[in-house]
Amino acid sequence: MNLEKLRARKGFICDMDGVIYLGSQLLPGVREFVSWLNENDKQFLFLTNSSERSPKELQQKLQRMGLDIGEEHFYTSALATAAFLKKQAPGCTAFVIGAPGLLNALYDVGVTMNDVDPDYVIVGETASYNYEVITKAVRLVLNGARLIATNSDLTGPTEFGIAPACRSLVAPVELATGRKAYFMGKPNPLMMRTGLHLLGVHSEEAAMVGDRMDTDVIAGMESGLATVLVLSGCTSRTDVNGYPYRPTYILNGVGEIVTG
């Protein structure tokens, strides 16, 4: 496989889980890939559908793994959700099922927490998900709150195996209310447009690197980027055959961008 055209791209948008790390384990070839990005003056952005951590926390997580990357290189679905609400409904209220990364992003744009009569019910990943909060969310949506989810990932990779992700968590609320959530993360074009804007490059000059066909690859393809599927996360080569579209490149991991 000739990777010269890929290496010539000016900008790289990379997913994190299953691409850069699995849980707390850095994946093989990542150090070399990040060094290559820096040495070749590439513009790069880690664009994650996870809403649990802030850019600062993601920076610190990679720092603990031995990678020193500036906070400006991270953008999350929590930030995308906050930016959407700031533009669509400034000063709105919300009942939030989510981790501090989501809550803080919403606070920062002036969203007020409200568990009585909120404008929105917002669902992200959290370890505190339980029957009580599902029931509360269902009742609020039935009473008129609009339903938003930070991303459409059904599952996500961890060092222990596959874990349920945001779409799995919001599904009971959708089923119980008959309302469909609006999903903010990849492949939502708003997320990709923001990523390209932060990179400062045009779509034809950039590549999207991810481990999911249904979010990363389709997001890149529909936004006009070259797409790189890495098999280090939750997608196998066989899985690709189940989709009507194909990535531009299929690699075992990001290290092959440098060495392949």
Per-segment meaning from a language model:
Residues 50:
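Conserved phosphate/oxyanion-binding catalytic-loop motifs
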